[in-house]
Structures are given as C-alpha cells and as structure tokens.
Amino acid sequence: MTTFLAGGTGTPKLLAGARRVFDPAETTVVGNTGDDVALGGLLVCPDLDTVLFEGGGVLDRETWWGIADDGSTTHDYLTDLAAAADIDPDTPRYLPDDAQTAGRDIARWRRFSAASEFMFIGDRDRAVHTLRAGLLDEGHTLTEVTRRLADAFDLSVDLVPMSNDPVATIVQTPDGEQHFQTFWVAEHGDPTVEDVEFRGGERATAAQPAIEAIRDGPVVVGPSNPVTSIGPMLALDGIADALRDAQVVAVSPFVEDEVFSGPAAKLMAAVGHDPSTAGVADAYDFADAFVLDTADSTDLDRPVVRTDTSLDTEADAERVARACRDALVAASGEVT
C-alpha cells in the first residue's frame, strides 16, 4: 500500500507517472477538500476532481483544471444573463454569514451565489458537481460519493477525501477575509496575506479511510502547496499523528527559495514558515525523507534524494516517483 496526499496540481502531476512505479491497485490518494466551494448549490471539489479527471483520462492538461474540450454553454449564458441583469459576473458573491451555516453541512463557510460564476465550470464538469450534490442530498457521505464517482471514471487508485466534514481555507487580508478561491481565482493571488485559517478544522473529523490509508503507508506528499493543499489535512485531529507513525517522503515544491508555481511562497511566509525548501522541512516535521531538485543544495537533517523535480511530462513524473521510492528506501535503512 502507498498513500499520496494530493492537493492543487503538484501531486496530480506526480500521479500521472507514479502508476508505473507504485501499483495503482495498492495506491490510495487522500484529497484535500479545503479548497471546495458551493457555487449555486453545486459542490465543486477542485482537488478531488483533478485526480478524478486525470485518472479518468479526461483532464484538461493545459490548465490542470476541468475536463478537456468541455463545452461552455451554461457558463456563457449565465455570464451574459448576469451582465444583462447588471451583475458583475467576475466578482464572487459570498453569501451572508447566516447562510454560510444553513443547509448542507459540507458546504459551510464556502457558499457562493451562482449569480456570479467567477470560476469557469464547463458543461460536463457541471454534470459531475450536480451528481455529487444530488448524492450528498440523498444522505451519502463525501467519501461514499467520491468513490462512486471514481468508479464512474474507472479510476485504478482508491480516491478518498480527507474528511466528510466541512473545512474551508480562509485567507486573511488587510481588507478582510476571503475564501481561498476568491483569493486565487478572482483576485489572482494578489492580495497581501496576513494569515490563513482552516475554518472548521478543529471540529472536523478525518475520514476513517484516509486515516487507515496513512497508517498503512508509506506516504508520499507530492509537491503541492504546503499551506493550502496539505495544511487543511494537518488541521484535522488524527492526521498529523498518523503521519508521525507512518513512513513519509515529501517532494519539495521549491528549489531552495524559488517556488515552482502558485502562491506557496506568499502563503508560507504568512503562516510563519520560511518560503523555501528549508521552510517546507520545518512544516513537515513528520517527514522521514525528502526529494529535492538537483539544483537545490539545501542541507536537511533527514535523508534526501535529488533529481530533476520538474513535472512537465509523464516521463518527468515517473522519474520523480522513482526518486520518491528511493527516498523511502533510504529512510527505512534498507539496502537495495
């Protein structure tokens, strides 16, 4: 059994080549749900969906978001209709506080009006969110729904969410708080970040399949954003402890102090970690070994395997996955 902690695009890119290194039938992927949004009643789970679509062979690999060649009929008409009604279609309309804790529990603190569809949702992509919302409304847990969707996409790995409870990543800025999707999609990551909150994390329970998969490890933490992709998982009671009991290798999303992509540097600094590979190692005190880029000379107190950590192709991903396997061997002290 091998377990991957997945969020954003870093770990899904790694998974694209990992299937040649780690047996998919013996692989579990635990997906971050802190980025999820309820948009017009639909539950959008970006990090789960990227794994679903990649494993199902339909992912838009240009954006690593949504379904390739998806239609935009509903999104376009909704945008035009909103504009005609004098509604700015690009400005998120976060629902009032009392609405954030009403209705479906899993959507707490992440509810947006569909009057402004600030995130592009394709027609087939929308069907996935519609089915997910419908099954949740029937009383199924997010774990159950995710596994049914994984079956529908014929995934070869077991995909489970980190929790069946709501945890929302909230970014604190000088102008007030924003859901992470407002910060990243609508504001393009421009606002100054003062802190990051994982709202609901102190009350949420980690999904049992996620805990079991981590305990059964070893665990691979891909080059995802340590704050917004992995942080929500660490906020859950039980996951950090399970990681400390497991054998864990982490791939740094930095080359020394240069991040590969995304807002990780800004967010790391905001939560008190140095935006660098050294800062990632401090944040991941549970990790037994690291995979670093060959250009990264950071000296760590744990075993390190170096390789080219770029993930532009499946061959790249396979190379990094093999480095992860080598790092796990190094951490265990086994001789190969």
UniProtKB/Swiss-Prot annotation:
Q: Which organism is it from?
A: Halobacterium salinarum (strain ATCC 700922 / JCM 11081 / NRC-1)
The reaction(s) catalysed by this protein are: (2S)-lactyl-2-diphospho-5'-guanosine + 7,8-didemethyl-8-hydroxy-5-deazariboflavin = oxidized coenzyme F420-0 + GMP + H(+)
Cofactor needs: Mg(2+)
What is the stated purpose of this protein?
Answer: Catalyzes the transfer of the 2-phospholactate moiety from (2S)-lactyl-2-diphospho-5'-guanosine to 7,8-didemethyl-8-hydroxy-5-deazariboflavin (FO) with the formation of oxidized coenzyme F420-0 and GMP.
The molecule here is called 2-phospho-L-lactate transferase
GO BP annotations listed:
F420-0 metabolic process
Q: Which NCBIfam families match?
A: F420_cofD (TIGR01819)
Give a yes or no for keyword Transmembrane helix in this entry: no
